[in-house]
């Protein structure tokens, strides 16, 4: 295993990269490759001051630590997630955290869980000292039953770290009366190492498979519940979306109705105003054209009607002419009589006797006789 399978660099986004892997113990699920770590890659949540745990592949671990002898008391190196100091074993890391960071309650990621095969690489805890005491106790404090647990936590070459941990050559497995496995220390020898490598690797693989299966079983329950929750959320979101769509449709229909009603009212108002304007304009045109070409609209008359109309017009014109002439003649005669009377007055003023015409004299006589006959007789004396 020369690659970090299933891991990608969060800076350059390279997946299944080779070489060293640096995992941040403060940021959740943040990994860097060697080049990005050495170049000082940072983000808004990750800085260069964050403690990083180095994880090696199997090839790099054999290259760096091949041929070295380590006992069970000297596992691989870990980094303190609080102060960033490196080179701790499980025992020394627990002692360091208990003595130096007992009162610290910051949420950090366990470096041991991140390095174990099948462990949770993003296990966050706010009581790191209690987590180390419960989950990562030293091998000398373990009994036979916990020895099996320690074998399950044995180093896997594909996820090793920069420091040494219990080597496979130092682990001897013998069958006990109860059928369990027990570990004992022995002196280092290449022949023993080569002989025990396949068995240790097989056991480590079996432990990793068991742990992964247990993790899958443990995660199957919450995954099913999470799926149910997601389905419920999707149903609720769909219901909300349908309600929102219905509200939008009703609002659109209402706006359309109001628009159509307003359009109809405006149309009726415009038609009424246009009709009123047309009637007013027609009346104005009729008033203006009362004496202009009115006869064009008259119906056509027959020949007899036309002759009768012309004769009536001729009679009217003659009557008007005679009336005008008579008025003019009367004015002239009256003016001439006045002139004659004035002359007679002037003649009488000169002492001359007025000569009465004959007819006038006769009329005066007749009037006098008639008056005498009509007078009543005088009363008797």
From Swiss-Prot:
<feature type="binding site">
    <location>
        <position position="36"/>
    </location>
    <ligand>
        <name>Zn(2+) 1</name>
    </ligand>
</feature>
<feature type="coiled-coil region">
    <location>
        <begin position="225"/>
        <end position="257"/>
    </location>
</feature>
<feature type="binding site">
    <location>
        <position position="33"/>
    </location>
    <ligand>
        <name>Zn(2+) 1</name>
    </ligand>
</feature>
<dbReference type="GO" id="GO:0005829">
    <property type="term" value="C:cytosol"/>
</dbReference>
<keyword id="KW-0967">Endosome</keyword>
<feature type="modified residue" description="N-acetylserine">
    <location>
        <position position="2"/>
    </location>
</feature>
<dbReference type="InterPro" id="IPR013087">
    <property type="entry name" value="Znf_C2H2_type"/>
</dbReference>
<dbReference type="Pfam" id="PF05605">
    <property type="entry name" value="zf-Di19"/>
</dbReference>
<dbReference type="InterPro" id="IPR000433">
    <property type="entry name" value="Znf_ZZ"/>
</dbReference>
<dbReference type="InterPro" id="IPR043145">
    <property type="entry name" value="Znf_ZZ_sf"/>
</dbReference>
<dbReference type="GO" id="GO:0141191">
    <property type="term" value="P:negative regulation of HRI-mediated signaling"/>
</dbReference>
<comment type="similarity">
    <text>Belongs to the KCMF1 family.</text>
</comment>
<keyword id="KW-0479">Metal-binding</keyword>
<feature type="modified residue" description="Phosphoserine">
    <location>
        <position position="189"/>
    </location>
</feature>
<keyword id="KW-0963">Cytoplasm</keyword>
<dbReference type="InterPro" id="IPR050774">
    <property type="entry name" value="KCMF1/Dystrophin"/>
</dbReference>
<dbReference type="GO" id="GO:0061630">
    <property type="term" value="F:ubiquitin protein ligase activity"/>
</dbReference>
<feature type="modified residue" description="Phosphoserine">
    <location>
        <position position="336"/>
    </location>
</feature>
<dbReference type="GO" id="GO:0008270">
    <property type="term" value="F:zinc ion binding"/>
</dbReference>
<feature type="binding site">
    <location>
        <position position="27"/>
    </location>
    <ligand>
        <name>Zn(2+) 2</name>
    </ligand>
</feature>
<dbReference type="GO" id="GO:0005764">
    <property type="term" value="C:lysosome"/>
</dbReference>
<feature type="binding site">
    <location>
        <position position="50"/>
    </location>
    <ligand>
        <name>Zn(2+) 2</name>
    </ligand>
</feature>
<keyword id="KW-0007">Acetylation</keyword>
<dbReference type="GO" id="GO:0005737">
    <property type="term" value="C:cytoplasm"/>
</dbReference>
<feature type="zinc finger region" description="ZZ-type">
    <location>
        <begin position="4"/>
        <end position="60"/>
    </location>
</feature>
<dbReference type="GO" id="GO:0005576">
    <property type="term" value="C:extracellular region"/>
</dbReference>
<feature type="binding site">
    <location>
        <position position="12"/>
    </location>
    <ligand>
        <name>Zn(2+) 1</name>
    </ligand>
</feature>
<feature type="modified residue" description="Phosphoserine">
    <location>
        <position position="2"/>
    </location>
</feature>
<dbReference type="GO" id="GO:0043161">
    <property type="term" value="P:proteasome-mediated ubiquitin-dependent protein catabolic process"/>
</dbReference>
<feature type="binding site">
    <location>
        <position position="9"/>
    </location>
    <ligand>
        <name>Zn(2+) 1</name>
    </ligand>
</feature>
<comment type="function">
    <text>E3 ubiquitin-protein ligase which accepts ubiquitin from an E2 ubiquitin-conjugating enzyme and then transfers it to targeted substrates, promoting their degradation by the proteasome. Together with UBR4, component of the N-end rule pathway: ubiquitinates proteins bearing specific N-terminal residues that are destabilizing according to the N-end rule, leading to their degradation. Does not ubiquitinate proteins that are acetylated at the N-terminus.</text>
</comment>
<feature type="zinc finger region" description="C2H2-type">
    <location>
        <begin position="78"/>
        <end position="101"/>
    </location>
</feature>
<dbReference type="GO" id="GO:0005886">
    <property type="term" value="C:plasma membrane"/>
</dbReference>
<feature type="binding site">
    <location>
        <position position="24"/>
    </location>
    <ligand>
        <name>Zn(2+) 2</name>
    </ligand>
</feature>
<keyword id="KW-0458">Lysosome</keyword>
<comment type="subunit">
    <text>Component of the SIFI complex, composed of KCMF1, UBR4 and calmodulin (CALM1, CALM2 or CALM3).</text>
</comment>
<dbReference type="GO" id="GO:0070534">
    <property type="term" value="P:protein K63-linked ubiquitination"/>
</dbReference>
<dbReference type="GO" id="GO:0070936">
    <property type="term" value="P:protein K48-linked ubiquitination"/>
</dbReference>
<keyword id="KW-0175">Coiled coil</keyword>
<feature type="region of interest" description="Disordered">
    <location>
        <begin position="294"/>
        <end position="314"/>
    </location>
</feature>
<dbReference type="GO" id="GO:1904813">
    <property type="term" value="C:ficolin-1-rich granule lumen"/>
</dbReference>
<dbReference type="GO" id="GO:0045202">
    <property type="term" value="C:synapse"/>
</dbReference>
């Amino acid at each position: 295993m020369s690659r970090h399978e299933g891991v990608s660099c969060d800076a350059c986004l390279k997946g299944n990269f080779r070489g060293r892997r640096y995992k941040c113990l403060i940021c959740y699920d943040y990994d860097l490759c060697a080049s990005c770590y050495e170049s000082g890659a940072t983000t808004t949540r990750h800085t260069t001051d964050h403690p990083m745990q180095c994880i090696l592949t199997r090839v790099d671990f054999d290259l760096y630590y091949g041929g070295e002898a380590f006992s069970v008391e000297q596992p691989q190196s870990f980094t303190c997630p609080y102060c960033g100091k490196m080179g701790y074993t499980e025992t020394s890391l627990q002692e360091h955290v208990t003595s130096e960071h007992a009162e610290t309650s910051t949420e950090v990621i366990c470096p041991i869980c991140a390095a174990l095969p099948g462990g949770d690489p993003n296990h966050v805890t706010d009581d790191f000292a209690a987590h180390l005491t419960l989950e990562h106790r030293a091998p000398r404090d373990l009994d036979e039953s916990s020895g099996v647990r320690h074998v399950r936590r044995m180093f896997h070459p594909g996820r090793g770290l920069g420091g040494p941990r219990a080597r496979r050559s130092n682990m001897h497995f013998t069958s006990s009366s109860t059928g369990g496995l027990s570990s004992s220390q022995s002196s280092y020898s290449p022949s023993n190492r080569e002989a025990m490598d396949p068995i240790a690797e097989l056991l480590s693989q079996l432990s990793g498979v068991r742990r992964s299966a247990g993790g899958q079983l443990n995660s199957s329950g919450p995954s099913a519940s999470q799926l149910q929750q997601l389905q419920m959320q999707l149903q609720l979101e769909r219901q909300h979306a349908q309600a929102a769509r219905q509200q939008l449709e009703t609002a659109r229909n209402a706006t359309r109705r109001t628009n159509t009603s307003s359009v109809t009212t405006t149309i009726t108002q415009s038609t009424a105003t246009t009709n009123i304007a047309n009637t007013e304009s027609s009346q104005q045109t009729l008033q203006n054209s009362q004496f202009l070409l009115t006869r064009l609209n008259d119906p056509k008359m027959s020949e007899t009607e036309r002759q009768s109309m012309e004769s009536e017009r001729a009679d009217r014109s003659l009557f008007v002419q005679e009336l005008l002439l008579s008025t003019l003649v009367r004015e002239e005669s009256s003016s001439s009589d006045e002139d004659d009377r004035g002359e007679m007055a002037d003649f009488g003023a000169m002492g001359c006797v007025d000569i009465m015409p004959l007819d006038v004299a006769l009329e005066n006589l007749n009037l006098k006789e008639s008056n005498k006959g009509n007078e009543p007789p005088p009363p008797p004396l």
